Amino acid sequence: MRKVDGLMKVLREAHCSPCLFLEQVTGTHWVGVEFLKHLPADWKCVHRDAVRFCEAVHQAGCGRIDLMPETICCEGARRAFGWMKNRNETLVQHLSEKTGVSSDRARELVERVPVLADPCAGVRVGDCTHADVLVTYVRPEAAMRLVRLWETATGRSLHVDISSIMAVCGNAVVKAYISQSISI
């Protein structure tokens, strides 16, 4: 049985979309993220400037954003989405210089961040209709309500690892997609 079966049952019984249900539970706006294997006919990669994925999630509250490797300016997100292979050392050096942690520690942190096994053709952010992952920025009270929903639906406590390294792209969205569990 998948970890999310109990939660999916709760969502089905609510008779509304997962996005709407989670918005009602947490009081926050949720954004869908869809990993596309092929670019659809309605693909509109019109983002003028390259953007960080975490910024796109925030901006998607105003409308859908379609992303490709060349429209994401963050190498961490490109790595998490499987678009950047064999470039960990670039990220390690950047992290070490930016934070002051040793290269060895930076390497450990970078290598722990999940990566999509099969790179996607594009990432659609903002549309909840066919979302692979739902994401939001929550306040503490909303986070507590969400965790309580998880515990009630699954009968288990939520165990999470939290990291500031590629926090939204890799350690939240890709990790949730791979594990089929809540990531923070």
Go through the PLM ranges and name each one:
Residues 2-184:
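Acidic, serine/proline-rich low-complexity intrinsically disordered regions
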